A protein has these predicted regions:
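Cytochrome P450
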Residues: 1-237
Length: 237
């Protein structure tokens, strides 16, 4: 090494850690910096872990179970797969209608009554805890005619409360809708049919979620794949 560069190698790494670097932009780092205004403090590790856990459930399992239940409804309604495969005009309706029929999240919101009430003939004392069930509301015969029938022409197809409503509506609702439409667009392009496979045990995830732990499907790959996608600005190949 030339004399003029002696000692440079030892010096170079030293200032590197002190130089400014772009702040991390991941969600966990963001949560670590959040100031909890209500209690005037940072979030605890337990609170951060709980938020991350809820994000995984809300961002993955809900859409996963929606797709799984939609596959079941396609198996149980002959002709619907082929109809949607060749005509994507009702794909959005299919996603909304199936989420209404089999809400991936059956209920999340728990409320405490502030006064005595009578609900559908049942006395509910003040201080009672009520668990609001989205799944039950979505098949209410007073709100939806023939609620257990898959109707791709149902009016006001987004009236369901699968994503809750009001100030507590799911912030990822529209993302989930897009994910489902894209997923089925790809599957309709590549497959000709899906059917129930063998050895399904129909064991469901316990708790507030609706979804089987395993779903075996049989399918036939399309000899001539389509390229209709979600039906927007697409053509046949």
């Amino acid at each position: 090494m030339p004399a003029r560069l002696e000692g440079l190698h030892d010096h170079t790494p030293q200032p590197a850690p002190t130089k400014p670097r772009p702040p991390p932009d991941d969600k966990v780092s963001f949560l670590c910096d959040v100031h909890y205004e209500a209690l005037d403090r940072k979030l605890t590790d337990l609170e951060i872990a709980g938020i991350v856990h809820a994000m995984i459930i809300g961002g993955l399992e809900t859409t996963q179970y929606a797709l799984e239940e939609q596959a079941q409804l396609l198996c149980e309604n002959p002709g619907t797969f082929e109809h949607l495969r060749t005509d994507r005009a009702k794909l959005r309706n299919f996603v909304e209608e199936t989420m209404r029929m089999r809400s991936p999240t059956h209920g999340l919101s728990t409320r405490m009554t502030s006064q005595d009430e009578v609900f559908q003939g049942v006395d509910v004392p003040a201080g009672s805890l009520l668990h609001v069930r989205f799944g039950a509301a979505n098949v209410d015969e007073e709100e939806f005619s023939c609620p257990f029938d898959l109707d791709l022409d149902r009016e006001a197809v987004t009236r369901h409360v699968t994503f809750s409503a009001g100030p507590r509506v799911c912030p990822g609702a529209n993302l989930s809708r897009i994910e489902q439409q894209i997923a089925w667009g790809v599957l309709f392009d590549r497959l000709e049919i899906i059917e129930y496979g063998a050895d399904n045990d129909w064991l469901h995830q316990p708790g507030i979620m609706l979804g089987t732990l395993r779903l075996n499907l049989a399918f036939r790959k399309a000899e001539t794949p389509l390229s209709l996608g979600t039906g927007r600005n697409a053509t046949r190949s």
